[in-house]
Amino acid sequence: MRLRLLVSAGMLLVALSPCLPCRALLSRGSVSGAPRAPQPLNFLQPEQPQQPQPILIRMGEEYFLRLGNLNRSPAARLSPNSTPLTAGRGSRPSHDQAAANFFRVLLQQLQMPQRPLDSSTELAERGAEDALGGHQGALERERRSEEPPISLDLTFHLLREVLEMARAEQLAQQAHSNRKLMEIIGK
């Protein structure tokens, strides 16, 4: 009876003990690129503001990862003197520039009109477009007709393979976490 109680208490302590934060979520130190050591949790001190967590934003069929403060103004544009080309060779654009580019693309996507595919107004617009830029439209249609469409069988085959890979990865992660738990309990 005491052994069961002791094992149960040990399992609860392991399950409810705070774990160290993920290395990717460590806040950056004063030296760029050098992570700070994780701080122990102290429930008696007042909360400190945390860094914002990444947010996944969907635009069409693509996903973008947004890091940073979402309350910051999205209207910030790149100034001509701070373009990535003038920042120096081999250097990356700053986070503010990346955020400005991200929000610029997001606003462009949101401002694009959304209309149904089979509407009569779209057919009329296509006719006007063909009359104005007939040569360009013809080249685009010709290019599309040359590319063979992806068959549904291939699509579903690829989807099945991706799902199997995800399932195998999930099982491997579960086995790894079980192994770690057994090592902790075994000690």
Swiss-Prot record:
Signal peptide, first to last residue: 1-24
Subcellular localization: Secreted
Source domain of life: Eukaryota
GO-annotated cellular components: extracellular space; neuronal cell body; neuronal dense core vesicle lumen; perikaryon; synapse; varicosity
InterPro entries cross-referenced by the UniProt entry: Corticotropin-releasing_fac_CS (IPR018446), CRF (IPR000187), Urocortin_CRF (IPR003620)
Alphabetical GO biological process terms: adrenal gland development; associative learning; cellular response to cocaine; cellular response to dexamethasone stimulus; diterpenoid metabolic process; female pregnancy; glucocorticoid biosynthetic process; hormone-mediated apoptotic signaling pathway
Keyword terms, alphabetized: Amidation, Cleavage on pair of basic residues, Hormone, Secreted, Signal
Tissue occurrence: Produced by the hypothalamus.
Region annotated Disordered, chain positions: 75-95
Chain residues in the propeptide: 25-144
Molecular functions per Gene Ontology: corticotropin-releasing hormone activity; corticotropin-releasing hormone receptor 1 binding; corticotropin-releasing hormone receptor 2 binding
Isoleucine amide modified-residue sites: 185
SMART domains named among the record's database cross-references: CRF (SM00039)
Function: Hormone regulating the release of corticotropin from pituitary gland. Induces NLRP6 in intestinal epithelial cells, hence may influence gut microbiota profile.
Family, similarity comment: Belongs to the sauvagine/corticotropin-releasing factor/urotensin I family.
Subunit-level organization: Interacts (via C-terminus) with CRFR1 (via N-terminal extracellular domain).
Record protein name field: Corticoliberin
Organism (species): Rattus norvegicus
